[in-house]
Amino acid sequence: DVCDSLVDGRCIHNGCYCERDAPNGNCCNTDGCTARWWCPGTKWD
């Protein structure tokens, strides 16, 4: 899945904290950062 938006443009996905305005524009999933938003870490953070 991609992230689900929760609060103020932030989202959480499987323990991953994501930010809309982060440089890469995507979010970590099981294979790395391939979903819509970026996250500073991994799925298992």
UniProtKB/Swiss-Prot annotation:
GO terms for molecular function, please? ion channel regulator activity; toxin activity
Q: List the disulfide bonds.
A: 3-16, 11-28, 18-33, 27-39
Instruction: Give the UniProt tissue specificity note.
Output: Expressed by the venom duct.
| Chain positions found as 4-hydroxyproline | 23, 40
Q: What keywords tag this UniProt record? A: Bromination, Disulfide bond, Hydroxylation, Ion channel impairing toxin, Neurotoxin, Secreted, Toxin
Q: Where is it chiefly localized?
A: secreted
Q: Which residues carry this modification: 6'-bromotryptophan?
A: 37-38, 44
Coiled coil feature spans: none
Any one of the GO CC terms:
extracellular region
Record's subcellular location: Secreted
The job of this chain, per UniProt, is described as: Mu-conotoxins block voltage-gated sodium channels. This toxin reversibly blocks voltage-gated sodium channel in cephalopods, with no alteration in the voltage dependence of sodium conductance or on the kinetics of inactivation.
Q: Domain notes, please?
A: The cysteine framework is XII (C-C-C-C-CC-C-C).
UniProt-recorded name of the protein:
Mu-conotoxin-like Cal 12.1.2b
Organism, scientific name: Californiconus californicus (California cone)
- Classification lineage: Eukaryota, Metazoa, Spiralia, Lophotrochozoa, Mollusca
